[in-house]
């Protein structure tokens, strides 16, 4: 039966727009119109289903190509941080005592609801800031030290690109070695296996999900890698015409180019995710390889969580979630 399910999975061509995210002992699944969070707390499964409201539905201009990529990226980050905070609430840090005086003062001034919004906004800001610092500004800063020794813009761009890739891969590898992150990456694998099972048209059972691949071509890991690659290509082109020796000019331009870079990456991933041919499979390979670091084989209890989260967002109208 397992072999039959595996063969059926490989033959399937359906691609769903449903995507997910691994949480602390849980999984977030986002479908058309709603998202679901399922967490395995010490007291059992906790479920939270929310209706999805997209900013680009309210403001159509934000749904235009390129622009929608940046909007979707920020929106996903905000929702992802909220989901992580929700899951973390069920596993409080035993080493943390009573709330600090600052926490008490902040809650008193803002109220609990506003304080949660403030913390979420701060977390998103720090996450976005760290990403920009590590993968965009730090490589430019480090490459600035070689300016006195090179005269070619092409060589400078090459060195900066190599530094950027080294930082990216080092970050991925270091994250994969963290013990606290190992189980999160197992849930990441569970999310992928469950999506594959659903796309294959198989019943969502632990047995059927267990045999699926844990590397998915439309994973966020692939998106981040493509962002880095696109930024290298765009930067190399732009800095061939701009004052490439001025480190501060380069940093400022990196910031200005972020929106088009993320936008182009989003459109690229949409195309690759929606087509299955030799070219798209080749383009998807680097992202699939990187998932060796960001996914681990899940156990059956994790698959149960991912299955439940997916079940909660599958639309009643068949095909509504088609890619």
Segments predicted by a language model, with ranges:
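Select subsegments of transmembrane alpha-helices in polytopic membrane proteins
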Residues: 117-135, 217-228
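Multi-pass alpha-helical transmembrane bundle typical of ion/small-solute transporters
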Residues: 53, 60, 70-73, 80-99, ...
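Juxtamembrane "helix exit" motif at the C-terminal ends of alpha-helical transmembrane segments
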Residues: 86-87, 127-152, 227-253, 266
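Divalent-cation
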Residues: 2-92, 99
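Hydrophobic alpha-helical membrane-embedded segments
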Residues: 64-86, 160-185, 258-274
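Polar-ligand-bearing catalytic/cofactor-coordination segments
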Residues: 2-23, 27-29, 99, 150, ...
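Hydrophobic alpha-helical transmembrane segments of multi-pass membrane proteins
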Residues: 122-133, 158-162, 166, 252-259
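Membrane interface segments of multi-pass transport proteins and intramembrane proteases
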Residues: 104-114, 142-159, 239-252, 271-282, ...
